């Protein structure tokens, strides 16, 4: 009888965890800690740190434990994007500092791809990050042809406001 109960317990835990009932708790990192890290990483790639900071807010509201079925961490990186820029294990995506390093590295890679085709702009960079470079290319690099994001921060960036979130230094 105890074996049946133990098996049922394991089955229920597996079922609930796969349905998202048992989730990681939020791990919201204070803006005052995130901002210096974002500035440091953005500078490495010649990116506007306020744009990157807005992306962190848009993706996770600065939650290091943010997770969807396909993306992890503060910058909501997919495993494919992660592997495009680092050999580090994807399990590290929940470490907010590593996630910012890799996420900004991925933004830097996308910036390089846009520069190569002479199409760089911050709205295009955001669209590439959100929907993929290939999806933007299929639309002739016209952000206006991309699906309008539900997220208000992304909507502002797509419309040309590349600094829609107040930074701690503002």
Task: Give the role of each language-model region.
Residues 12-19:
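Hydrophobic h-region of N-terminal signal peptides that target proteins for export
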Residues 19-62, 89, 97-100, 115, ...:
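Export/targeting segments at the very N-terminus of extracytoplasmic proteins
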Residues 79-138:
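Alpha-helical segment that forms one wall of the substrate-binding/catalytic cleft
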């Amino acid at each position: 009888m105890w074996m049946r109960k133990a098996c049922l317990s394991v089955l229920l835990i597996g079922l609930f965890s796969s349905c998202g009932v048992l989730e990681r708790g939020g791990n919201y990192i204070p803006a005052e800690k995130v901002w210096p890290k974002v500035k440091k990483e953005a500078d490495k790639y010649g990116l506007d740190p306020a744009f990157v900071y807005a992306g962190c807010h848009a993706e996770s509201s600065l939650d290091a434990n943010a997770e969807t079925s396909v993306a992890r961490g503060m910058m909501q990186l997919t495993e494919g994007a992660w592997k495009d820029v680092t050999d580090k294990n994807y399990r590290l995506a929940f470490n907010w500092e590593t996630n910012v390093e890799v996420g900004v590295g991925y933004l830097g890679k996308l910036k390089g791809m846009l520069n190569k085709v002479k199409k760089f702009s911050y709205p295009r960079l955001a669209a590439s990050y959100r929907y993929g470079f290939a999806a933007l290319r299929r639309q002739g690099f016209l952000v206006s042809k991309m699906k309008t994001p539900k997220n208000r921060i992304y909507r502002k960036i797509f419309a040309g406001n590349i600094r829609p979130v107040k930074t701690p230094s503002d």
